[in-house]
């Protein structure tokens, strides 16, 4: 397993050498890793984020083995009146997927990771999740925001198939194959550091360890190189 801060680490890897990649990309404005200008989280807006992110996708296209997978963990992003001019949601997962598709990656899989809306309400005080909104103006009410693990496949003929034996029984496969993972512990993550910008909490994208375990278990062979471009922390 290898990790770095986006592209500099990837530039040292040989072509077609990585068996699998899994990470949580920086969410513009809301999440940050460091003060470095090379940190993708340190951007002014979504357009600047994707301009930077494009270089990473190009590197992933180069270093991934043909027929192998890249998984990214993400969520729809809340839009605020102060920052965006309206209250609503932004389709960040769709924007990420389309960015990968522009580089030739193939949309392969998507799983929804359930998150407790009560916990989200207590943490964010989002207008759409407050019970008082049901009474005062329920047109503004919405559901909680889940996480997603979206997987894309590098095109080309696979030279080494990923195979499993008795260690991957049918009951485990049925659990992993579910389109909704209900049993992911949201606090089982690698944490880096916290920071604050105005009154909004800026923290790293919390990719749960069990999500990493399932991706690696399903989509890798022993001794594969697994790349996490953001130090495994996202």
Description of each model-found segment:
Residues 1-234:
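Core catalytic lobe of class I
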């Amino acid at each position: 397993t290898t990790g770095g801060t986006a592209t500099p680490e990837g530039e040292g890897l040989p072509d077609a050498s990585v068996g699998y990649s899994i990470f949580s990309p920086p969410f513009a404005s809301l999440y940050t890793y460091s003060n470095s200008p090379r940190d993708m989280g340190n951007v002014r807006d979504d357009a600047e984020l994707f301009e930077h992110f494009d270089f990473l996708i190009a590197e992933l296209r180069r270093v991934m083995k043909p027929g192998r997978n890249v998984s990214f963990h993400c969520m729809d992003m809340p839009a605020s009146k102060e920052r965006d001019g309206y209250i609503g949601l932004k389709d960040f997962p769709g924007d990420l997927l389309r960015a990968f598709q522009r580089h030739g990656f193939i949309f392969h899989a998507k799983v929804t990771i359930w998150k407790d809306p009560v916990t989200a309400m207590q943490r964010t005080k989002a207008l759409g999740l407050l019970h008082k909104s049901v009474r005062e103006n329920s047109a503004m009410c919405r559901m909680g925001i889940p996480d997603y693990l979206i997987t894309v496949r590098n095109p080309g003929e696979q030279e080494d198939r990923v195979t499993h034996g008795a260690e991957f029984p049918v009951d485990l496969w049925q659990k992993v194959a579910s389109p909704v993972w209900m049993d992911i512990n949201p606090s089982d993550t690698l944490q880096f550091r916290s920071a604050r910008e105005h009154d909004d909490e800026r923290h790293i994208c919390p990719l749960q360890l069990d999500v990493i375990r399932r991706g690696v278990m399903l989509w890798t062979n022993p001794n594969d190189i697994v790349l996490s471009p953001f130090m495994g922390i996202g």
